[in-house]
């Protein structure tokens, strides 16, 4: 199984012999593709390109989003942010709380000169954004701003201002810490509820 941000890379991975493709859209937390293709656009494109099963990722945290991904041709979904914020997650409580308190637009893509990465806005993000907006920042300068183990500082050690807080846009839909079981049951139940609602629609 290989994660891809584009149909072009999906085709290369299939040719190399992978058994399935995870197609991750621009909404995903952490490292992203340079193409910045959203999940809504990426999934159909990848499904039309490859014959192996496609697993949708990026911005999926609810049953409605899961059903939408399946409707576009995905045979499954990969859910990251919703489970990263679960009670059982090894992420720090401070990280979980900061992500839960955030809303729409609270995460941004940055570090495009290194590897495009979606982060929660904080003091570290502001320093990165300021350097990038200067127009002449080097990769080495960006690495210096990040410092060593930036994601470890933010996610696991709870430094919510000077650490790298990697989380997806779907964190905006999460308003409390649930167990993994509660999260899974909620997603599956909502997916089935919306599936039945769609089946009840009368076509002209």
Give residue spans per PLM region.
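Active-site mouth loops of central-metabolism enzymes
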Residues: 1-3, 174
